[in-house]
Amino acid sequence: EYNEERGKKVIKYVKNFLDETVPIANASWKEISDIKVKGEDLVFLIGKKENSLKDKQQFIGFNGEKNKLTSILVKKNKLHIDILIDKDNMIGKSDKASIANVVIESALSTIIDNEDSVAAVDSEDKVRCYRNWLGLMKGDLIANMNKNGKKFIRRLNPDRKYISRNGNKISLHGRALLLNRNVGHLMTNPAILLKDGSEIPEGIMDAFVSTLCALHDFKNKNNSRTGSVYIVKPKMHGPEAVSYIHLRAHETRHDLV
């Protein structure tokens, strides 16, 4: 249940944040009653008076109509801030400018772990890990959920679409940058047996399969913007371990090519 008193404090905090991050010239976000787009600029209404951003170049794009916005995209330190506007929203109703939410782009990355945070000890476990990573690289991973009697499907967030200040289309990544954490060098796994019957070094298997799965992303670039795969190799205790994995990674790259 929405707590209106707490909501007022949150709104005040957010307006202070916007005043510091994307300040309005000679005014405060607390004062505005409406926001519109005129030409290539944002216009903030305080009564009948019009104001603009102190730095107009912070305005990147928007959604909705210029006189009836549903979101505003601004930028600070190369990270985007999406200001959502909805006068019918429970929070938007309590704000003079109908601001319902503020979504901040994160510079964080996300590690998909094959080691300490999962108990992948046999072939079936490893296949499950690889299948999840493949789904992330192809962008089609889903999870069927049942929570409190309600069934729903979780999917990867789509890219976020906007109209730029000059009328062009903008697309921003809607997902965090993913890295794959392989297992350490000392582990072996019976999922693949070598010619002599011994188990494959699990870190080598992880490196090969996780890179193979990432080939799907090289084409569509849903994860990497540069057509790369990001692999974390843990527990390297000295130059010998680093040299070992560097050599094996170089050989794997040539095999894949």
Language model segments and positions:
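Catalytic or ion-translocation cores adjacent to nucleophile or general acid/base/metal-coordination motifs
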Residues: 223, 253, 257
